[in-house]
UniProtKB/Swiss-Prot annotation:
Domain of life: Eukaryota
Keywords of the record: Amidation, Neuropeptide, Secreted
GO biological process: neuropeptide signaling pathway
Residues found modified as Glycine amide: 6
Native source organism of the sequence: Locusta migratoria
Name of the protein: Locustakinin-1
Cell compartment(s), UniProt: Secreted
Amino acid sequence: AFSSWG
C-alpha cells in the first residue's frame, strides 16, 4: 500500500 499527503 502507498499513501501520500502533501
